[in-house]
Design a protein with these regions (language model features):
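Extended lipid/amphipathic-ligand handling interfaces
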Residues: 49, 85-90, 112, 234-241
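Sec-dependent bacterial lipoprotein signal peptides
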Residues: 1-22
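Flexible, processing/modification-adjacent segments and terminal tails
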Residues: 41-44, 123-205, 284
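A mature extracytoplasmic/lumenal domain signature
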Residues: 64-66, 92-94, 100-104, 116, ...
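Gly/Pro-enriched, hydrophobic low-complexity segments
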Residues: 23-24, 169-287, 291
Length: 308
């Protein structure tokens, strides 16, 4: 046999062998099957749900268990604090009070109040009284509680109505990984309502509200600042109906910029009971070490240039 014919035969053999299955193997890729019956809704139905539920709540008072975690990549460590009992008061349009109690003895661990613009924080164990505007940020690793702003909690607890004058809401179909029995993760479809708000510099993403398609209830809310950064990531679980309102009895509020995570487990809840103004008054205790964050911020600003 000539060299040419031997070469051609070898070439044909090398071409045919992979097709015969001798040089490769295949295996099945199993897609985890979601056996849960999924519900459907339109964009307008989800928007109407948000607005209707928000309009039904004017005030709330609750006994809660407070679970707190502080830290992350920025701090280089994560600290889990012992769960404590507390009391939560809310009143529209922006009033909030959160009181935490020490374990066993039930003395106050902290007392925090806000009117939506300014806040006050009393930490009895350190005789420290902090006050300032809600938008003043602090970075005090030795006092992580001072980084917590009541407004973050308020905005996460109560879904705000969508303002048709200044906001646009659109729906997207998405999926999330959920853990089923035996720790198997499956991909489950959900609905996301993106709320875009008109700002001074144009339109910005304000919120993402994620609805589970197993029950068509909001199970997550992402709130963004004007630069597109997530300020709070709230997760809602264990819904119960209270006075015609579906309200989550477990709320986890993560604040990634502050590396502060607080979970509220509701023990007792009352909605739309009268809450007078004096319920949101926090007086400065005598002899307290006062920290005015507004003055601290003013002192940290460089002095304006003057003409010589």
């Amino acid at each position: 046999m000539s060299f040419f014919f031997r070469y051609r035969a070898l070439l044909v053999l090398l071409t045919v062998l992979p097709l015969s299955g001798c040089l490769f193997r295949s295996r099945k890729v199993v897609q985890p099957v979601d056996t849960v019956q999924l519900k459907t809704a339109t964009q307008q139905e989800l928007i109407d749900y948000i607005n209707t539920q928000a309009s039904k709540i004017q005030s709330a008072q609750a006994t809660v268990d407070i679970d707190t975690t502080v830290g992350g990549v920025k701090k280089g460590k994560v600290t889990d604090y012992q769960e404590i009992r507390g009391y939560l008061l809310l009143r529209k349009p922006a009033m909030l009070r959160l009181i935490g109690l020490m374990p066993i003895v039930r003395n106050k661990a902290f007392d925090m109040v806000s009117d939506g613009q300014r806040f006050k924080l009393w930490i009895p164990s350190k005789s420290r009284f902090v006050m300032g505007r809600n938008d003043v940020e602090t970075r005090n690793p030795s006092q992580p509680l001072e980084s917590l702003r009541p407004q973050y909690i308020y905005d996460s607890l109560l879904l705000r109505q969508i303002d048709p004058q200044n906001e646009i809401a659109v729906m997207e179909n998405d999926t999330e990984l959920v853990t089923e029995v035996k720790s198997h993760k499956i991909s489950r479809a959900d609905y996301v309502i993106d709320v875009v708000r008109k700002g001074p510099q144009g339109w910005v993403l304000a919120r993402k509200i994620v609805f589970s398609r197993t029950d068509l209830l909001p199970h997550r809310q992402l709130i963004y600042d004007g630069d597109g950064n997530v300020t709070t990531n709230a997760v809602y679980e264990k819904y119960k109906e209270e006075n015609g309102v579906n309200f989550p009895w477990q709320i986890e509020i993560a604040m990634p910029q502050q590396e502060y995570d607080i979970t509220l487990n509701i023990v007792k809840l009352e909605l739309n009971e009268p809450l007078p103004d004096d319920k949101f008054v926090l007086e400065q205790p005598p002899g307290a070490d006062v920290v005015d964050l507004d003055k601290r911020e003013a002192h940290s600003q460089p002095a304006p240039a003057t003409d010589k």
